[in-house]
Amino acid sequence: MTAGFIDLPEVFPLEQGGELNGVRVAYRTWGEPRAEATLICHALTGSADADDWWEGLFGLGKVFDPSRDYIVAANVLGGCSGTTGPTSRKPGRLAHFGPDFPAVSIRDMVRLQALLLDHIGVERLRLVIGGSMGAMQTLEWALMYPDRVDAIVPIGIGAAQSPWAVGLSEAQRHAIVNDPWFRSGRYRKGRGPDGGLATARMIAMCSYRSPDNFATRFGRVEQDGEGFAVQSYLRHQGAKLVDRFDANAYLTLLAAMDGYDLGRDRGPLEAVLRHAETPALVVGISSDVLYPATEVAELAHSLGNAEFALLDKPQGHDAFLIETDELNTIVAEWLQRERGRTPVVAAEGAGR
């Protein structure tokens, strides 16, 4: 694995107005550099360290096999993992952007990824893949750069951010901005809205899992001095995010997700999807309450050249990060059919 970054010399215009100077893109690569690559797009609080959070898909004979393919992942614009975002310093100044960071869109993220690929010599993408917010980027790749992409695998997403998902985003946003330490986004490092960000993560985690998953995993078990086990779990998840994420970046990315709509400024959604001819495997999750499988299946049936696959697991939306053995099989078998090549399903223990 190689870690790197590029600094764009040119001004980067943003879809919703405004521009950024001196944009930095942090990225990771695996395998030998070449003109064709696989691009992995990460979710809301993910990063370019895909071999960490998607470890089960990496290895000899698996979907991501560095001995076979050149693989790239980049931290998204607006995040806080190395690519320019609210925690970055303003050009030529000591001050950080903070709440002054401009609004970004999923399409901005994709355009920046395209510039990165130009810089490192990748001309064509054999596969673009991602789940959740990563799936939003994946689908935009097929619409924005159809001549550059051979195949896509979006996981756990519909054609636009639903009112249900926007509502959940708003609850998380409300928790952050109403924390007294938020201070209109002008908080100091180490003295920010930790409680609000932790609460936002707790809300999100409830949407990432499922009622059956919580019932099976936690039941009504109580822990000494900590209440129910599920309460302790959610508090732990909130605290973990506070240690590694920035509240302004979280708000920036939530807004980008809420603005996601494949039909926006392109015409009627039905026609936009029908004319999308990039081969696609659209994966839904049977227990997903954030992006229900019916919503994902509707997207698959509307695209011009897509198959639908169901990851039938109880963990909810996060199943794409948990049930990686089955996901690897689903994607690998589709790639085998699509490419007509040697199967890429891993043998027992391969690549571990």
What are these regions (language model features)?
Residues 1-40, 344-352:
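Catalytic-loop region of hydrolases
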Residues 28-91:
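N-terminal cap/lid subdomain of alpha/beta-hydrolase-fold enzymes
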Residues 95-100, 107-127, 136:
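Conserved acidic catalytic loop of the alpha/beta-hydrolase fold
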Residues 124-167:
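Conserved hydrolase catalytic core segment
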Residues 148, 154-240:
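Alpha/beta-hydrolase-fold enzymes
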Residues 276, 282-284:
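Short beta-strand/loop motif that positions the catalytic acidic residue
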Residues 289-295:
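Conserved alpha/beta-hydrolase "acid-adjacent" motif
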Residues 297-298, 305-352:
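Catalytic active-site module of serine/aspartate enzymes centered on a nucleophile-bearing elbow/loop
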